[in-house]
Amino acid sequence: MRPSLQLETIEARLANQTVTTQEIVPGQREAAVALVLQPEVSGLRALFILRAKKEGDPWSGQMALPGGHRETIDADLVETARRETHEEIGLDLNQAGRYLGSLAGIRANPRAGFDLVVTPQVFALEDKAVPLQPNEEVAE
């Protein structure tokens, strides 16, 4: 199966799904991560990062999708995922990516114990020659 057909299938399924949203209660934080898919001849690749080790970071040293907390400047969680991805690895999803849809949010259970709902946002990377520039939060 060609990767473009796989992306089309993923996009169609995301468009046709009913996303169950987590109820956000007062004091609870929201975050978004970007699941970035890149078509290759052999199939799809997904972009992961290795978070830098940092004292006090509940996700320190873990493999992750780029993303982070929703800020007041973010219109929605798609914008959060785009902003955080650009900040963390220099990838501008507004230019190099195509938004495919959202997955259901999940409650995170960080070691720090605070309440957080993380919602994955799915993108297709359409430009294969995009250089990544990790910031200090990313080991690789």
Task: Give the ranges of each region predicted by the language model.
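N-terminal strand-loop-strand
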Residues: 22-65
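Entry/capping segment at the start of metal-dependent catalytic domains
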Residues: 1-25
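Charged, low-complexity, helix/coiled-coil-prone segments
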Residues: 17-35, 123-139
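Acidic/proline-rich low-complexity IDRs
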Residues: 4-6, 13, 34, 43, ...
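Short N-terminal helix-initiation segments at or just after the protein's N-terminus
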Residues: 10-13, 60-69, 85
